[in-house]
From Swiss-Prot:
Name of the protein: Glutamyl-tRNA(Gln) amidotransferase subunit A
Function according to Swiss-Prot or TrEMBL: Allows the formation of correctly charged Gln-tRNA(Gln) through the transamidation of misacylated Glu-tRNA(Gln) in organisms which lack glutaminyl-tRNA synthetase. The reaction takes place in the presence of glutamine and ATP through an activated gamma-phospho-Glu-tRNA(Gln).
EC number annotated for this UniProt entry: 6.3.5.7
Family of the protein in this entry: Belongs to the amidase family. GatA subfamily.
Gene designation per UniProt: gatA
Catalytic residues (UniProt): 79 (charge relay system), 154 (charge relay system), 178 (acyl-ester intermediate)
Amino acid sequence: MRLYDLTAHRLRELLLGREVSAAELCRSVLNRIDEVEGRVKAYVTLDREGALRQAAAVDRELQNGRELPPLAGIPFAIKDNICLRGLPATCSSKILHNWVPPYDATVVEKLKDQQTVILGKTNMDEFAMGSSTEHSAFFTTRNPWDPKRVPGGSSGGSAAAVAAGSAICALGSDTGGSIRQPASFCGVVGMKPTYGLVSRYGLVAFASSLDQIGPLTRDVTDCALVMNAICGHDHRDSTSVPKEVPDFTSFLVDDVKGMRIGLPREYFPAELDDGVRRIVMEAVSVFEERGAYVEETSLPHTEYALPVYYLIAPAEASSNLARYDGVRYGYRAPECEDVLDMFRVSRSRGFGAEVKRRIMLGTYALSAGYYDAYYLKALKVRTLIRRDFEEAFEKFDVLLSPTAPETAFIIGAKTEDPIRMYLSDIFTLAVNLAGLPGMSVPAGFVAGLPVGIQFIGKPFAEGTLLRMGYAFQQSTDHHRQRPPETPGGEIS
Protein backbone atom coordinates (compact mmCIF):
# COMPACT_ATOMS: atom_id res chain seq x y z
CA MET A 1 0.00 0.00 0.00
CA ARG A 2 1.47 3.34 -1.09
CA LEU A 3 0.52 5.56 1.83
CA TYR A 4 1.65 8.71 0.02
CA ASP A 5 -1.04 8.14 -2.63
CA LEU A 6 -3.97 8.05 -0.19
CA THR A 7 -6.32 10.82 0.87
CA ALA A 8 -6.22 12.43 4.30
CA HIS A 9 -9.60 11.02 5.30
CA ARG A 10 -8.57 7.48 4.34
CA LEU A 11 -5.27 7.86 6.20
CA ARG A 12 -7.15 8.99 9.29
CA GLU A 13 -9.11 5.74 9.22
CA LEU A 14 -5.85 3.79 9.03
CA LEU A 15 -4.30 5.81 11.86
CA LEU A 16 -7.29 5.40 14.17
CA GLY A 17 -7.49 1.69 13.33
CA ARG A 18 -3.79 1.32 14.24
CA GLU A 19 -3.16 -0.15 10.79
CA VAL A 20 -0.41 2.41 10.27
CA SER A 21 1.47 4.80 12.53
CA ALA A 22 2.00 8.51 11.96
CA ALA A 23 5.74 7.86 11.82
CA GLU A 24 5.28 5.23 9.08
CA LEU A 25 3.12 7.65 7.12
CA CYS A 26 5.65 10.45 7.54
CA ARG A 27 8.52 8.22 6.42
CA SER A 28 6.49 7.05 3.42
CA VAL A 29 6.04 10.65 2.26
CA LEU A 30 9.66 11.59 3.01
CA ASN A 31 10.85 8.58 1.00
CA ARG A 32 8.54 9.66 -1.80
CA ILE A 33 10.11 13.11 -1.70
CA ASP A 34 13.53 11.48 -2.07
CA GLU A 35 12.24 9.60 -5.13
CA VAL A 36 10.61 12.47 -7.01
CA GLU A 37 12.11 15.73 -5.78
CA GLY A 38 14.98 15.52 -8.26
CA ARG A 39 12.54 15.89 -11.13
CA VAL A 40 9.60 17.78 -9.55
CA LYS A 41 11.50 20.29 -7.38
CA ALA A 42 8.49 21.21 -5.25
CA TYR A 43 10.26 22.15 -2.01
CA VAL A 44 12.41 25.16 -1.14
CA THR A 45 12.92 23.99 2.46
CA LEU A 46 12.39 20.50 3.90
CA ASP A 47 12.21 19.91 7.67
CA ARG A 48 12.73 16.15 8.00
CA GLU A 49 13.61 16.12 11.69
CA GLY A 50 10.75 18.40 12.63
CA ALA A 51 8.27 16.31 10.64
CA LEU A 52 9.40 13.07 12.28
CA ARG A 53 9.16 14.69 15.74
CA GLN A 54 5.61 15.82 15.02
CA ALA A 55 4.68 12.34 13.78
CA ALA A 56 6.16 10.71 16.89
CA ALA A 57 4.11 13.05 19.09
CA VAL A 58 0.93 11.98 17.28
CA ASP A 59 1.81 8.32 17.81
CA ARG A 60 2.24 8.93 21.55
CA GLU A 61 -1.23 10.51 21.65
CA LEU A 62 -2.65 7.48 19.83
CA GLN A 63 -0.96 5.07 22.23
CA ASN A 64 -2.41 6.97 25.18
CA GLY A 65 -5.89 6.59 23.71
CA ARG A 66 -6.51 10.31 23.34
CA GLU A 67 -9.01 11.66 20.84
CA LEU A 68 -7.21 13.29 17.94
CA PRO A 69 -8.25 16.15 15.63
CA PRO A 70 -9.36 15.15 12.10
CA LEU A 71 -6.02 16.04 10.46
CA ALA A 72 -3.67 14.67 13.14
CA GLY A 73 -0.64 12.97 11.63
CA ILE A 74 -1.37 14.14 8.07
CA PRO A 75 1.74 15.42 6.21
CA PHE A 76 1.30 19.00 4.96
CA ALA A 77 3.35 21.30 2.74
CA ILE A 78 3.22 25.09 3.19
CA LYS A 79 3.73 27.68 0.45
CA ASP A 80 6.84 29.73 1.10
CA ASN A 81 5.00 33.04 1.54
CA ILE A 82 3.26 31.74 4.69
CA CYS A 83 5.21 32.25 7.92
CA LEU A 84 6.31 29.18 9.86
CA ARG A 85 8.40 29.93 12.93
CA GLY A 86 11.95 28.65 12.64
CA LEU A 87 11.91 27.93 8.90
CA PRO A 88 12.83 30.43 6.16
CA ALA A 89 10.02 32.33 4.45
CA THR A 90 11.75 33.41 1.25
CA CYS A 91 8.76 33.99 -1.04
CA SER A 92 11.17 32.38 -3.54
CA SER A 93 13.00 35.71 -3.71
CA LYS A 94 16.66 36.61 -3.32
CA ILE A 95 15.67 39.63 -1.26
CA LEU A 96 14.26 37.36 1.50
CA HIS A 97 16.66 34.45 1.05
CA ASN A 98 17.84 34.51 4.68
CA TRP A 99 14.72 35.67 6.52
CA VAL A 100 13.38 33.32 9.20
CA PRO A 101 10.08 34.48 10.75
CA PRO A 102 9.91 34.49 14.56
CA TYR A 103 6.19 33.66 14.55
CA ASP A 104 3.61 31.38 12.93
CA ALA A 105 0.90 32.52 10.55
CA THR A 106 -2.58 31.99 11.93
CA VAL A 107 -3.22 29.16 9.47
CA VAL A 108 -0.03 27.45 10.63
CA GLU A 109 -1.14 27.80 14.26
CA LYS A 110 -4.42 26.18 13.28
CA LEU A 111 -2.64 23.30 11.52
CA LYS A 112 -0.44 22.79 14.57
CA ASP A 113 -3.57 22.71 16.73
CA GLN A 114 -4.74 19.91 14.44
CA GLN A 115 -1.43 18.09 15.09
CA THR A 116 -0.60 17.90 11.41
CA VAL A 117 2.91 16.95 10.31
CA ILE A 118 4.45 19.94 8.52
CA LEU A 119 7.04 18.77 6.00
CA GLY A 120 8.44 22.07 4.77
CA LYS A 121 7.98 25.06 2.46
CA THR A 122 7.14 24.85 -1.23
CA ASN A 123 8.48 26.74 -4.22
CA MET A 124 6.45 29.52 -5.84
CA ASP A 125 6.65 32.40 -8.27
CA GLU A 126 8.56 35.19 -6.56
CA PHE A 127 6.23 37.05 -4.17
CA ALA A 128 3.37 35.08 -5.80
CA MET A 129 3.72 37.05 -9.04
CA GLY A 130 3.38 34.52 -11.83
CA SER A 131 1.39 31.67 -13.31
CA SER A 132 4.04 29.00 -13.86
CA THR A 133 6.51 28.95 -10.91
CA GLU A 134 9.19 29.90 -13.45
CA HIS A 135 9.64 33.24 -11.69
CA SER A 136 11.14 31.64 -8.57
CA ALA A 137 14.60 33.00 -7.79
CA PHE A 138 15.78 29.46 -7.00
CA PHE A 139 14.53 26.97 -9.60
CA THR A 140 11.52 26.02 -11.70
CA THR A 141 9.12 23.47 -10.25
CA ARG A 142 8.00 20.85 -12.79
CA ASN A 143 4.64 19.26 -13.41
CA PRO A 144 4.52 15.65 -12.10
CA TRP A 145 2.39 14.67 -15.11
CA ASP A 146 5.09 15.84 -17.54
CA PRO A 147 8.36 17.29 -16.17
CA LYS A 148 8.83 19.30 -19.36
CA ARG A 149 5.78 21.36 -18.42
CA VAL A 150 4.97 23.91 -15.73
CA PRO A 151 2.84 23.06 -12.68
CA GLY A 152 1.08 26.42 -12.86
CA GLY A 153 1.51 29.20 -10.38
CA SER A 154 2.08 30.89 -8.21
CA SER A 155 1.36 27.97 -5.84
CA GLY A 156 3.03 25.53 -8.23
CA GLY A 157 5.19 23.88 -5.59
CA SER A 158 2.20 23.11 -3.36
CA ALA A 159 0.12 21.72 -6.24
CA ALA A 160 3.01 19.64 -7.58
CA ALA A 161 3.77 18.24 -4.12
CA VAL A 162 0.20 17.00 -3.64
CA ALA A 163 0.02 15.58 -7.18
CA ALA A 164 3.37 13.81 -6.87
CA GLY A 165 2.66 12.27 -3.46
CA SER A 166 5.32 14.35 -1.72
CA ALA A 167 2.59 15.84 0.51
CA ILE A 168 -0.91 14.67 1.34
CA CYS A 169 -2.31 18.20 1.58
CA ALA A 170 -0.85 21.66 1.10
CA LEU A 171 -1.60 25.32 1.64
CA GLY A 172 -1.27 27.91 -1.10
CA SER A 173 -2.32 31.49 -1.63
CA ASP A 174 -4.56 32.84 -4.37
CA THR A 175 -4.41 36.46 -5.59
CA GLY A 176 -5.70 35.98 -9.13
CA GLY A 177 -5.89 32.21 -9.55
CA SER A 178 -2.71 31.03 -7.86
CA ILE A 179 -4.37 28.06 -6.14
CA ARG A 180 -6.95 27.13 -8.77
CA GLN A 181 -4.82 27.32 -11.93
CA PRO A 182 -2.01 25.05 -10.61
CA ALA A 183 -4.69 22.74 -9.20
CA SER A 184 -6.06 22.42 -12.73
CA PHE A 185 -2.61 21.89 -14.27
CA CYS A 186 -1.63 19.25 -11.68
CA GLY A 187 -4.95 17.40 -11.38
CA VAL A 188 -5.75 18.21 -7.75
CA VAL A 189 -8.49 20.11 -5.88
CA GLY A 190 -7.84 23.76 -5.07
CA MET A 191 -10.08 26.14 -3.10
CA LYS A 192 -9.85 29.93 -3.01
CA PRO A 193 -12.08 30.94 -0.07
CA THR A 194 -14.22 34.07 0.19
CA TYR A 195 -12.10 37.11 0.99
CA GLY A 196 -11.89 37.42 4.77
CA LEU A 197 -12.88 33.84 5.63
CA VAL A 198 -9.27 32.69 6.22
CA SER A 199 -6.86 34.88 8.18
CA ARG A 200 -4.07 36.54 6.22
CA TYR A 201 -1.99 37.13 9.36
CA GLY A 202 1.45 35.74 8.57
CA LEU A 203 0.91 35.72 4.80
CA VAL A 204 3.54 37.87 3.09
CA ALA A 205 1.43 40.38 1.19
CA PHE A 206 1.30 40.71 -2.58
CA ALA A 207 -2.03 42.51 -3.14
CA SER A 208 -3.82 42.94 0.16
CA SER A 209 -7.36 43.31 -1.20
CA LEU A 210 -7.03 40.14 -3.29
CA ASP A 211 -4.82 37.63 -1.41
CA GLN A 212 -6.39 34.59 0.24
CA ILE A 213 -4.92 31.40 1.70
CA GLY A 214 -6.54 28.10 0.73
CA PRO A 215 -6.03 24.33 0.48
CA LEU A 216 -4.74 22.04 -2.26
CA THR A 217 -5.85 18.45 -1.74
CA ARG A 218 -6.43 15.07 -3.42
CA ASP A 219 -10.22 15.21 -3.28
CA VAL A 220 -13.12 17.38 -2.17
CA THR A 221 -13.54 15.59 1.17
CA ASP A 222 -9.97 16.48 2.12
CA CYS A 223 -10.63 20.05 0.99
CA ALA A 224 -13.59 20.28 3.38
CA LEU A 225 -11.48 18.93 6.26
CA VAL A 226 -8.74 21.50 5.66
CA MET A 227 -11.29 24.30 5.35
CA ASN A 228 -12.70 23.28 8.73
CA ALA A 229 -9.21 23.62 10.16
CA ILE A 230 -8.08 26.96 8.70
CA CYS A 231 -11.22 29.13 8.54
CA GLY A 232 -12.38 31.45 11.28
CA HIS A 233 -12.16 35.01 12.56
CA ASP A 234 -8.78 36.38 13.63
CA HIS A 235 -8.49 39.70 15.47
CA ARG A 236 -4.92 40.06 14.18
CA ASP A 237 -6.19 40.42 10.59
CA SER A 238 -8.27 43.55 10.03
CA THR A 239 -9.84 41.99 6.92
CA SER A 240 -10.95 38.83 8.74
CA VAL A 241 -14.73 38.49 8.82
CA PRO A 242 -16.34 37.75 12.22
CA LYS A 243 -18.54 35.00 10.86
CA GLU A 244 -19.41 31.62 12.32
CA VAL A 245 -17.78 28.86 10.29
CA PRO A 246 -19.95 25.85 9.44
CA ASP A 247 -18.82 22.24 9.41
CA PHE A 248 -17.88 22.06 5.76
CA THR A 249 -18.08 18.25 5.73
CA SER A 250 -21.85 18.59 6.26
CA PHE A 251 -22.09 19.84 2.65
CA LEU A 252 -20.62 16.63 1.23
CA VAL A 253 -23.95 15.38 -0.08
CA ASP A 254 -24.25 13.30 -3.24
CA ASP A 255 -27.22 15.26 -4.58
CA VAL A 256 -27.37 18.16 -7.05
CA LYS A 257 -30.97 17.73 -8.16
CA GLY A 258 -32.55 21.14 -8.67
CA MET A 259 -29.26 23.03 -8.40
CA ARG A 260 -29.14 26.00 -10.77
CA ILE A 261 -25.85 26.17 -12.68
CA GLY A 262 -24.87 29.14 -14.85
CA LEU A 263 -22.35 28.92 -17.69
CA PRO A 264 -20.85 32.41 -18.29
CA ARG A 265 -20.51 32.73 -22.05
CA GLU A 266 -17.47 35.00 -21.61
CA TYR A 267 -15.64 32.03 -20.05
CA PHE A 268 -16.14 29.92 -23.20
CA PRO A 269 -14.50 32.08 -25.91
CA ALA A 270 -13.73 30.86 -29.40
CA GLU A 271 -10.03 30.74 -28.46
CA LEU A 272 -10.64 28.19 -25.69
CA ASP A 273 -8.66 25.00 -26.24
CA ASP A 274 -10.94 22.44 -27.94
CA GLY A 275 -9.93 19.66 -25.57
CA VAL A 276 -10.60 21.80 -22.51
CA ARG A 277 -14.00 22.81 -23.91
CA ARG A 278 -14.91 19.16 -24.48
CA ILE A 279 -13.93 18.16 -20.93
CA VAL A 280 -15.91 21.01 -19.38
CA MET A 281 -19.03 20.23 -21.42
CA GLU A 282 -18.76 16.56 -20.45
CA ALA A 283 -18.75 17.70 -16.82
CA VAL A 284 -21.83 19.84 -17.50
CA SER A 285 -23.56 16.73 -18.87
CA VAL A 286 -22.82 14.88 -15.62
CA PHE A 287 -24.72 17.54 -13.67
CA GLU A 288 -27.60 17.63 -16.16
CA GLU A 289 -27.96 13.85 -15.94
CA ARG A 290 -28.16 14.16 -12.17
CA GLY A 291 -31.02 16.64 -12.27
CA ALA A 292 -29.27 20.01 -12.17
CA TYR A 293 -30.65 22.93 -14.19
CA VAL A 294 -28.00 24.38 -16.53
CA GLU A 295 -28.30 27.58 -18.54
CA GLU A 296 -25.96 30.03 -20.23
CA THR A 297 -25.56 33.44 -18.60
CA SER A 298 -23.46 36.56 -19.08
CA LEU A 299 -20.90 38.48 -17.03
CA PRO A 300 -20.57 41.43 -19.42
CA HIS A 301 -17.64 43.21 -17.75
CA THR A 302 -15.42 40.11 -17.83
CA GLU A 303 -13.43 41.56 -20.75
CA TYR A 304 -12.13 44.28 -18.42
CA ALA A 305 -11.09 41.92 -15.61
CA LEU A 306 -7.54 41.37 -16.88
CA PRO A 307 -6.60 45.07 -17.27
CA VAL A 308 -8.36 45.94 -14.00
CA TYR A 309 -6.44 43.22 -12.18
CA TYR A 310 -3.11 44.31 -13.66
CA LEU A 311 -3.70 47.85 -12.43
CA ILE A 312 -4.98 47.07 -8.93
CA ALA A 313 -2.68 44.15 -8.03
CA PRO A 314 0.60 45.83 -9.10
CA ALA A 315 -0.49 49.08 -7.43
CA GLU A 316 -0.96 47.27 -4.12
CA ALA A 317 2.25 45.29 -4.67
CA SER A 318 4.30 48.44 -5.26
CA SER A 319 3.17 49.69 -1.86
CA ASN A 320 3.56 46.37 -0.02
CA LEU A 321 7.03 45.66 -1.41
CA ALA A 322 8.36 49.12 -0.55
CA ARG A 323 9.32 47.67 2.87
CA TYR A 324 12.09 45.56 1.34
CA ASP A 325 14.92 48.08 1.33
CA GLY A 326 17.97 46.19 2.57
CA VAL A 327 17.81 47.80 6.01
CA ARG A 328 15.77 45.65 8.38
CA TYR A 329 15.90 42.14 6.91
CA GLY A 330 16.66 40.25 3.74
CA TYR A 331 19.29 40.93 1.11
CA ARG A 332 21.53 43.99 1.46
CA ALA A 333 23.85 44.91 -1.40
CA PRO A 334 27.48 45.22 -0.24
CA GLU A 335 29.87 48.10 -0.89
CA CYS A 336 27.29 50.81 -1.56
CA GLU A 337 28.27 54.48 -1.64
CA ASP A 338 25.50 55.75 0.65
CA VAL A 339 22.06 54.86 2.03
CA LEU A 340 20.17 55.81 -1.14
CA ASP A 341 22.58 53.73 -3.21
CA MET A 342 22.01 50.79 -0.84
CA PHE A 343 18.23 51.10 -1.30
CA ARG A 344 18.56 51.20 -5.07
CA VAL A 345 21.11 48.41 -5.50
CA SER A 346 19.55 46.09 -2.89
CA ARG A 347 16.15 46.27 -4.56
CA SER A 348 17.58 46.06 -8.08
CA ARG A 349 19.58 42.93 -7.30
CA GLY A 350 17.16 41.44 -4.78
CA PHE A 351 14.00 41.45 -6.90
CA GLY A 352 13.55 39.39 -10.07
CA ALA A 353 12.46 40.75 -13.44
CA GLU A 354 8.73 39.99 -13.07
CA VAL A 355 8.51 41.57 -9.61
CA LYS A 356 10.31 44.68 -10.84
CA ARG A 357 7.98 44.84 -13.84
CA ARG A 358 4.92 44.82 -11.60
CA ILE A 359 6.38 47.32 -9.11
CA MET A 360 7.03 49.71 -12.00
CA LEU A 361 3.55 49.18 -13.41
CA GLY A 362 1.94 49.75 -10.02
CA THR A 363 4.03 52.82 -9.25
CA TYR A 364 3.08 54.29 -12.62
CA ALA A 365 -0.64 53.64 -12.00
CA LEU A 366 -0.46 55.40 -8.62
CA SER A 367 1.65 58.35 -9.75
CA ALA A 368 0.42 61.92 -9.94
CA GLY A 369 -1.41 62.58 -13.17
CA TYR A 370 -2.27 58.91 -13.75
CA TYR A 371 -4.04 57.93 -10.51
CA ASP A 372 -7.47 59.09 -11.68
CA ALA A 373 -7.01 57.89 -15.26
CA TYR A 374 -5.91 54.37 -14.34
CA TYR A 375 -6.13 53.26 -10.71
CA LEU A 376 -9.35 55.04 -9.75
CA LYS A 377 -11.04 53.95 -12.97
CA ALA A 378 -9.94 50.35 -12.31
CA LEU A 379 -11.57 50.47 -8.87
CA LYS A 380 -14.84 51.63 -10.43
CA VAL A 381 -14.79 48.84 -13.03
CA ARG A 382 -14.01 46.35 -10.24
CA THR A 383 -17.34 47.35 -8.71
CA LEU A 384 -19.08 46.65 -12.03
CA ILE A 385 -17.47 43.21 -12.18
CA ARG A 386 -18.75 42.47 -8.68
CA ARG A 387 -22.25 43.59 -9.66
CA ASP A 388 -22.19 41.23 -12.67
CA PHE A 389 -21.71 38.33 -10.27
CA GLU A 390 -24.40 39.62 -7.91
CA GLU A 391 -26.92 39.73 -10.76
CA ALA A 392 -25.95 36.25 -11.93
CA PHE A 393 -26.40 34.82 -8.43
CA GLU A 394 -29.94 36.15 -8.29
CA LYS A 395 -30.74 33.38 -10.78
CA PHE A 396 -28.07 30.72 -10.19
CA ASP A 397 -26.69 28.83 -7.20
CA VAL A 398 -23.27 28.39 -8.75
CA LEU A 399 -21.34 29.29 -11.90
CA LEU A 400 -19.29 26.70 -13.78
CA SER A 401 -16.39 27.33 -16.16
CA PRO A 402 -12.99 26.05 -17.21
CA THR A 403 -10.37 26.81 -14.57
CA ALA A 404 -7.75 27.64 -17.20
CA PRO A 405 -7.94 28.15 -20.97
CA GLU A 406 -5.45 25.33 -21.64
CA THR A 407 -3.52 22.48 -20.11
CA ALA A 408 -0.05 22.89 -18.61
CA PHE A 409 2.31 24.49 -21.13
CA ILE A 410 5.95 23.74 -21.89
CA ILE A 411 8.52 25.34 -19.58
CA GLY A 412 9.85 28.49 -21.25
CA ALA A 413 6.98 28.81 -23.73
CA LYS A 414 5.65 32.08 -22.26
CA THR A 415 8.50 33.63 -20.31
CA GLU A 416 9.31 36.10 -23.10
CA ASP A 417 5.70 37.24 -23.51
CA PRO A 418 4.18 38.55 -20.25
CA ILE A 419 0.73 39.07 -21.80
CA ARG A 420 0.47 35.41 -22.83
CA MET A 421 1.46 34.44 -19.29
CA TYR A 422 -1.11 36.79 -17.75
CA LEU A 423 -3.85 35.25 -19.90
CA SER A 424 -3.33 31.94 -18.07
CA ASP A 425 -5.47 33.38 -15.25
CA ILE A 426 -8.17 34.88 -17.46
CA PHE A 427 -10.94 32.69 -15.94
CA THR A 428 -9.86 33.01 -12.30
CA LEU A 429 -8.86 36.58 -11.53
CA ALA A 430 -12.38 38.09 -11.65
CA VAL A 431 -13.26 35.86 -8.69
CA ASN A 432 -10.57 37.59 -6.63
CA LEU A 433 -11.66 41.04 -7.80
CA ALA A 434 -15.18 40.24 -6.56
CA GLY A 435 -13.99 38.56 -3.33
CA LEU A 436 -15.89 35.35 -4.13
CA PRO A 437 -15.10 31.70 -3.40
CA GLY A 438 -13.83 29.56 -6.27
CA MET A 439 -12.80 25.93 -6.48
CA SER A 440 -11.05 23.86 -9.15
CA VAL A 441 -11.81 20.14 -9.38
CA PRO A 442 -10.16 17.60 -11.73
CA ALA A 443 -12.50 16.92 -14.65
CA GLY A 444 -10.52 14.85 -17.15
CA PHE A 445 -7.44 14.74 -19.34
CA VAL A 446 -6.32 16.08 -22.70
CA ALA A 447 -3.32 14.27 -24.19
CA GLY A 448 -2.48 12.89 -20.74
CA LEU A 449 -2.59 16.30 -19.02
CA PRO A 450 -5.15 17.21 -16.34
CA VAL A 451 -8.00 19.66 -16.91
CA GLY A 452 -9.92 21.33 -14.09
CA ILE A 453 -13.41 22.77 -13.92
CA GLN A 454 -14.07 25.83 -11.78
CA PHE A 455 -17.06 26.39 -9.52
CA ILE A 456 -17.75 30.00 -8.49
CA GLY A 457 -20.10 30.75 -5.61
CA LYS A 458 -21.78 33.54 -3.71
CA PRO A 459 -19.85 35.10 -0.82
CA PHE A 460 -19.37 32.51 1.94
CA ALA A 461 -21.00 29.78 -0.18
CA GLU A 462 -18.00 27.45 0.01
CA GLY A 463 -20.43 24.74 1.12
CA THR A 464 -22.25 24.92 -2.21
CA LEU A 465 -18.97 24.53 -4.10
CA LEU A 466 -17.99 21.56 -1.95
CA ARG A 467 -21.40 19.97 -2.56
CA MET A 468 -20.99 20.39 -6.32
CA GLY A 469 -17.45 19.05 -6.31
CA TYR A 470 -18.30 16.12 -4.07
CA ALA A 471 -21.26 15.07 -6.21
CA PHE A 472 -19.10 15.31 -9.33
CA GLN A 473 -16.43 13.12 -7.76
CA GLN A 474 -19.03 10.50 -6.84
CA SER A 475 -19.79 10.17 -10.57
CA THR A 476 -16.21 10.34 -11.90
CA ASP A 477 -12.77 9.03 -11.02
CA HIS A 478 -10.51 11.75 -12.46
CA HIS A 479 -9.36 12.73 -8.96
CA ARG A 480 -8.17 9.17 -8.33
CA GLN A 481 -5.70 9.23 -11.21
CA ARG A 482 -2.02 9.63 -10.35
CA PRO A 483 0.90 10.85 -12.49
CA PRO A 484 2.84 8.17 -14.38
CA GLU A 485 5.90 6.79 -12.63
CA THR A 486 9.13 7.95 -14.23
CA PRO A 487 12.75 7.85 -13.05
CA GLY A 488 13.42 10.26 -10.21
CA GLY A 489 16.82 11.53 -11.31
CA GLU A 490 17.82 15.11 -11.94
CA ILE A 491 16.58 16.88 -15.05
CA SER A 492 18.91 19.52 -16.42
